[in-house]
Amino acid sequence: MIWYPYEQMKTMKAPYKIIKAKGVHLYTEDQKLIDSVSSWWCMIHGYQHPELTAAIQEQAANFCHVMLGGLTHDPVEKLSAKLEGFLPGDLNYCFFSDSGSVAVEVALKMALQYNTNQCDDHPEMKKRTLILALEHAYHGDTFKAMEVGDDEDYHFAFDKKEGVVHIPTEIPALEEAFALYHDKLNCFIVEPLLQGAGGMRMYDISFLKRARELCDEYGVLLIFDEVATGFGRTGNRFVADLVLPDILVLGKALTGGYIGHAVTVANEKVFRGFYSDNERHALMHGPTFM
């Protein structure tokens, strides 16, 4: 039996049974429906796009999946180079995973361990573990992603830990949070400009610009979760083109929705925080599918 997402299985209505999908349409036995939610915002080129279908068929004839543990291959190298070519600034270091939620987990692990590695090398530095996030945020359903999210409808059954502070998208609240917590703050994670599952809430670019200034002033890492907003959803290709984060998370439209895939992209500063002769400073994360 299938256990469906976000449903009370006892009372849920029978789902539409899809037998075919093409373009913007989903087909049942007797209906042609417009997929206005784009399979949770990932099918940006529509279903059965001939170029994407052909690419998958061509790759499958060679191999579908090879792990990156001790191995590499042309497709992942080409994808990484392509991302490096059109992402802004020095966002050049791509860590691949299988979903947006996992990519958020990787981003938070990067940020927290970045500080740990620095403290190893510089004992006079203070450990920083507090994470700043936004009210009404949604970053996924895995555990750390739930912690930085702020939606009781999704995550009411799980206790919040004390390591996250949520603020509204208002500059005075942002400045107050940095004034209060700057010596404890590790990172600030946001869905830039548009909060998706939290209610399609938009806010002004001035908030992000001020966040960048404060992060620079106090040595806090800025993380943009563009799983939903990336690839043109806000007008620009990425909000990161307007305000540059230290870590960028992409998913959903990354593959046009044809396979589950995501990437966490770090800048030079973050990557250098792991590049060391000390084996303990390696990023110890490795999804099967990446």
PLM region spans:
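Conserved N-terminal phosphate-binding loop of PLP-dependent enzymes in the Aspartate aminotransferase
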Residues: 1-290
